[in-house]
Curated annotation (Swiss-Prot):
Protein name per the record: Methionine--tRNA ligase
Reaction equation(s) it catalyzes: tRNA(Met) + L-methionine + ATP = L-methionyl-tRNA(Met) + AMP + diphosphate
GO molecular-function terms, A-Z: ATP binding; metal ion binding; methionine-tRNA ligase activity; tRNA binding
Binding site for ATP: K330
Domain of life the protein comes from: Bacteria
């Protein structure tokens, strides 16, 4: 029996362009939704632009536009960029809608009626020049702890200290530069603590959150839930609060309600809407980043509980996107906009690469462009695409492009691939995409070995029917492999369906074979990544930043003196702090493969399974102490977040820990049973 699922991804804020960090979540969600549809479930995918708040109001003023016209332009740009990466929404809406306004007002009034809203006067910064109360991020000054200048009103970007805007020294309004004054104002608060027990019970029911997210929520429960300020003083771009004068809903109140507005706008039918949001006849699944867990794991479900709606069925929480182990940087050219990436590189390659890196946990997703090139060219193009192209062009032409029937050997190989279906389905459901990609490429290796063993390009010269048999087996296997891959690379899979002369590749027709059939013309499925395009993309990103921010470009920390960097991280006595030690991510790894490296006396090439972190390739200088054979199956300790290093023989993505010298090296191994990916503490 098919399921009914409503899926959302977090709403992009309407004050900037879509970048690769946004694409991570959009693609992660899209893969999951496509999979659900491919197995026959009814699944809707809703999103919207998050359009309210002071930053929108100020940005529009600087641009000489109304907030309404600006957010309309940005929403069109966002939709274009997101869909260019193959993200297929059922509705991409806006929070500045009539539906959202009505839902926000009715939810608030219900909460107020039920005693969950309280009014209280608070003191906050006010700019007499701009005649407005200032949000924390519109106040700047000197950090009260480290003395760093030009820091925001809520935290210091230099030392990391959090504080109140009142604690800033030499504070000023970031809009006009004048010194703000303190004024008292009435604010409205949502009594989140009223729902502590309900929220705990909700969290513990079923499989709502991954382990990391559940632990984080438990920390907040332990420290006690606090009231939440849901109002802002005018002028403010947002929805006016009913029964109040010059008060507006804080953007984080109406933003998640945008999921409901987008749903109703698409479904039209209130009966269908209520099946999801009131009656619980369908599942509601949110995909979010770990930085907004507090809002989606506490405020949002509590608001729904207090106003007669169903809380989400599941929160899928992911980590941040990093590049080479570091935050994305505009000055280094790694803070890449989606439109810039799509201009120079194939977006389906990035979808595939993200799938290779994405597990089901909250760990940050680190990408390396060296690894991107290697994975795509080797696993996607060399392994999977090449499997199809090598038997679908001239060889198939020489047999009038007609397939034969599967031999006994062919049926056996097809059955082996089909036996992985349940495992692959389970991995997709749990969002463990990296496992799916490993399984697919592993099966692809087996099929390619079959093709190489028979060499149909030679066989066609002497035995056409045997060659037809080999090609028939190869392409039936390719149909299965690309069906498994269909949620990730829909464009490639669509081209393959055209080749097979069938409407689509779906899990619903997975077991159907293609025999005694004339195939369509072969169209190139995908090309290899050219490294020069990556260089051009990064250069353009850096140059764009430098032109628009000449002063910041001069202060690029990546160009600072190396001695200064060293002295900032290691103290004179040689000690490091616990914070510095915590940056090193040590995990248990299971060695899956080990091979000698041709032309290297000391190196072994090792593939290490790190669980949800995926498979890491490592070039380890341990050949004098270990044979390749004795390493396979061994559990070791791995530095998992080491910056990938391009070596002569390939990309090394991690480091094995060992002690000793030369021929007496001894690998660190867990003392007791441990699972791949376990974090050392």
């Amino acid at each position: 029996m098919s399921k009914h699922i409503l899926v959302t991804s977090a709403l992009p804020y309407a004050n900037g362009s879509i970048h690769l960090g946004h694409i991570l979540e959009a693609v992660q969600t899209d893969i999951w939704v496509r999979f659900q549809k491919l197995i026959g479930n009814e699944c809707y995918f809703f999103c919207a632009d998050d359009t309210h708040g002071t930053p929108i109001m100020i940005a529009a003023k600087k641009a000489g536009k109304t907030p309404e016209s600006m957010i309309e332009e940005v929403q069109k740009e966002h939709y274009k960029d997101l869909t260019s990466f193959g993200v297929e929404y059922d509705n991409y809406y806006t929070t500045n809608s009539e539906e959202n306004k009505k839902f926000s007002e009715s939810i608030y009034l219900t909460l107020k009626k039920n005693g969950h809203i309280v009014a209280r006067n608070i003191e906050q910064s006010y700019c007499e020049h701009d005649k407005m109360f200032l949000p924390d991020r519109f106040i700047k000054g000197t950090c009260p702890k480290c003395g760093a200048k030009d820091q925001y009103g809520d935290s210091c970007e230099v030392c990391g200290t959090s504080y109140s805007p009142k604690d800033l020294k030499d504070s000023y309004c970031s809009i006009c530069g004048t010194t703000p004054v303190l004024r008292e104002s009435k604010h409205l608060f949502f009594k989140l603590q009223d729902f502590q027990n309900q929220l705990k019970n909700w969290m513990e029911e079923g499989n709502r959150l991954n382990e990391g997210a559940q632990k984080k929520l438990q920390e907040w429960f332990t420290s006690g839930l606090q009231e939440w300020d849901i109002s802002r003083d005018g002028p403010y771009f947002g929805f006016a609060i009913p029964e109040e004068e010059n008060k507006y809903f804080y953007v984080w109140l109406d933003a998640p309600i945008g999921y409901m507005a987008s749903s109703l706008n698409h479904l039209k039918d209130e009966r269908k809407f209520n099946e999801f949001w009131k009656e619980g006849k369908g599942e509601i699944v949110h995909f979010i980043g770990k930085d907004i867990l507090y809002f989606h794991g506490l405020f949002w479900p509590a608001m729904l509980m207090g106003s007669g709606y169903k809380a989400p069925s599941q929160l899928n929480v992911h980590g941040f996107l990093t590049v080479n182990g570091e935050k994305m940087s505009k000055s280094r050219g790694t803070f890449i906009n989606a439109s810039t990436f799509a201009k120079y590189l194939d977006v389906e390659h990035f979808r595939f690469y993200l799938a290779c890196r994405l597990g089901s946990g909250m760990e940050d997703v680190d990408i390396s462009f060296d690894d991107f090139v290697s994975r795509v060219n080797s696993d996607l193009i060399g392994n999977l695409v090449n499997l199809v192209s090598r038997v679908s062009t001239s060889i198939l032409d020489k047999m009038d492009r007609k397939l034969g029937i599967l031999s006994t050997e062919g049926k056996s190989l097809v059955s082996e691939l089909l036996s992985k279906e349940t495992e692959i389905r389970e991995a997709y459901v749990s969002r463990n995409y990296s496992k799916v990609m490993r399984d697919i490429t592993g099966l692809g290796d087996k099929v390619n070995k079959y093709v190489n063993d028979y060499a149909p390009w030679n066989l066609i010269k002497t035995d056409v029917e045997k060659a037809r048999e080999v090609v028939t087996t190869s392409l039936n296997c390719a149909k299965i492999l690309f069906t498994y891959l269909a949620p990730v690379t829909p464009k490639i899979v669509h081209s393959l369906a055209d080749l097979f002369q069938i409407p689509n590749l779906s899990f619903l027709n997975l077991t159907e074979t293609i025999e005694n059939k004339v195939l369509g013309p072969y169209q190139m499925l995908s090309k290899r990544v050219e490294e020069k395009n990556i260089t051009i993309m990064i250069t353009e990103t850096k140059e764009t930043f430098e032109k628009s921010n000449p002063e910041k470009a001069k202060q690029d920390p990546s160009k600072s003196n190396t001695n200064e960097v060293k002295s900032a991280t290691v103290s004179e006595d040689g000690f490091i702090t616990i914070d510095e030690l915590s940056k090193v991510e040590l995990r248990v790894g299971l060695i899956k493969e080990a091979n000698p490296v041709e032309g290297a006396d000391k190196l072994l090439f090792v593939k290490v399974d790190l669980g949800e972190k995926g498979i890491k390739n490592v070039f380890a200088g341990i050949k004098a102490s270990y044979t390749a054979e004795e390493l396979v199956g061994k559990k070791v300790v791995v530095v998992a977040n080491l910056k990938p290093r391009q070596m002569k023989f390939g990309l090394s993505e991690a480091m094995l820990l060992a002690s000793g010298k030369d021929k007496t090296l001894s690998l660190f191994v867990p003392d007791r049973d441990a699972s791949p990916g376990d974090l050392l503490k």
